[in-house]
Structure formats: C-alpha cells, structure tokens
Regions:
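Ligand-binding cleft/hinge of the Venus flytrap
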Residues: 7-13, 91-115, 145-149
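A ligand-binding cleft/hinge motif common to bilobed small-molecule-binding domains
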Residues: 42-50, 96-97, 127-160
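Extracytoplasmic small-molecule ligand-binding "clamshell" domains
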Residues: 1-42, 188, 197
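Periplasmic-binding protein-like
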Residues: 60-67, 91-96, 142, 146-198, 201-216
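Short beta-strand-centered segments that line the small-molecule binding cleft or hinge
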Residues: 28-42, 49-62, 155
Length: 216
C-alpha cells in the first residue's frame, strides 16, 4: 500500500513516481547520496535514522511476529530460536539484538537471527519451516498472514508501536512539499481509501508530521 500512497502523492503533485527496487538497507544511503529522491518502504522513523534523513510521518505501526500454524512462539521468550527478518529493518537492527542480549545476559542461548534481502524470502523461510518465527512491522506481517493463512499465524500481539515515515534527504525542501501533499490526501479522504483497500486502517493518522520519533 506504500506504492498506492506514493502514487497518490505524485498524482496530487502532477508528477509520475518512478520506482527502483532496492535492498532495504541500501535505501537510506542512496537517498543521502542523491540517487533517490524519496524512500517509501515501510520505514520505521527512529531517532538514529533521523540523523541521516528526514521522515514525513504517515502511519503508526508496531512489530508483529508470526509462527507456523499451530506452533506456540512467545516473542518475549525466544532465546535460542531461529527468527527470520529482512536485513536493515528495525527488527534486525534494534528489536532482535536487544532481545538476544537479554537472553545472553541471563545465561541463555542467543536468538539466531537469519537475515534476508527481502521480506518475501523471510516469509518463505517461515512457511518452509526453516525458522521458528519471523519478525516484521505489523502491516507486513498481517499481509503475509493473509496470503499464507493456512500455514502461518500471528505469534502474540503487536508491540513497539512507532511512526512510519517517507524518507527524504536531510533538510531538503521536498520534505514540506510531501508533508503538505500528504495532509491534502488525508483531508480529501484519499488516504483513508488506500488504507481501507489494504486492510491497514488501524494505524492511520489524522495529521501528517515530520520526524515524529524525536518528538516522542
């Protein structure tokens, strides 16, 4: 649904959005290097990432784990388990390292984090039983479950709720342009229609913001 939102922003501005598929952890360096104008990839806005780029906030999401159907996995008690993630995501860089450290500090086995270049690969690893669980942002996990509901299911509830943001080069005038355009889409109902189409209304916002993570 990120693509639908980006297309709506482009349409409102009278421009056509051009897309380049990239590994998640290459997107921010490509923005700061001038290769991409925007990064639209379900980015969790964090204070650390705000040091490199600005974020136009458009959604609130959390982390949601998934496990194979019928298997019980507790995200808060995952020591020694194999967990799939997409490389460079919040789950890879923040959530799982912290959880794994808690395990080892308590004398337990570390979480075995299996990193994949794409979310589809991480999901497939779970479907095939190569890992015990996967961790991803809640809309991503919910979508994966909807497509593989006979094989995987949610493990626990959504946690660590945080703002999503469209990444823009630090200090670029484009940031305010995107924010104002997003607000126009919220006000005219287009934004809600997109969220409803994809079944992700729960994290919708009523006002666009910039760098919300540093304001929390």
């Amino acid at each position: 649904w990120d693509v639908d939102l980006a297309n709506a922003i482009g349409a409102k501005l009278g421009v056509t959005v051009e897309y380049t598929i990239s590994k998640f952890d290459n997107i921010i360096p490509s923005i700061t290097g001038g290769r991409y104008g925007l990064g639209v990839s379900s980015f969790t806005d964090t204070v650390e990432r705000e040091k490199q780029v600005d974020f136009v906030n458009y959604y609130n999401a959390g982390v949601l784990w998934a496990a194979q159907k019928g298997k019980t996995v507790d995200p808060d008690n995952a020591c020694g388990l194999k967990v799939a993630v997409e490389a460079g995501t919040y789950e890879d860089t923040d959530e799982l390292p912290a959880k794994s450290k808690t395990c080892t500090d308590a004398g337990k086995q570390a979480i075995q984090v299996l990193k994949f270049d794409g979310q589809d690969q991480a999901t497939n690893a779970l479907v095939l039983g190569q890992v015990d669980a996967m961790s991803a942002d809640s809309p991503i996990t919910e979508y994966a479950i909807s497509k593989q509901s006979d094989k995987i299911e949610a493990a626990g509830k959504t946690f660590d709720i945080a703002p999503y943001g469209i990444a823009v080069n630090k200090g670029a005038p484009l940031t305010d342009v995107i924010k104002n355009t997003l607000q126009a889409l919220i006000d005219d109902g287009t934004y809600t229609k997109i969220l409803t189409k994809w079944g992700v209304q729960d994290g919708g916002v009523t006002a666009a913001d910039v760098n919300a993570a540093s304001k929390q």
